Amino acid sequence: MGDFIRSRADAGRVALVATGGLSHWVGTPETGRINPDWDHYVLDCVTRGDIEPLTRLTWGEIERDGGNGGQEIRNWIALLGAVPGWKGEVLAYEPVDEWITGCATAWVHP
């Protein structure tokens, strides 16, 4: 995705947006569980600008530690892969029991 955007002569300034929750379990016996430790692990990778540990997570590892909803971090990973030399800043994090998910907002810039 990043290569395609950069290949366009008329690309100018482009904003990419990735959405998805952090840890949450949906429609399982564990529904309502949130794993703040795992959420912070993911956010620490974003803050450090280190995508490699996230790309190495297997489906099973994400499912175990982040729940079936934790698979949504793949959207984040796709965005991070499109922005070379990015730096991340976590603006907010909260495990929101009422929404049964770990919620965060992060800013990523080259």
Q: What spans do the regions from the language model cover?
A:
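Flexible, D/E/H-enriched segments
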Residues: 3-10, 29-110
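Beta-strand elements within well-structured catalytic alpha/beta cores of enzymes
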Residues: 12-22
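Short, hydrophobic/aromatic alpha-helical segments in well-folded domains
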Residues: 1-4, 18-19
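Short acidic/glycine-rich loop or secondary-structure boundary segments that cap or lie
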Residues: 24-28
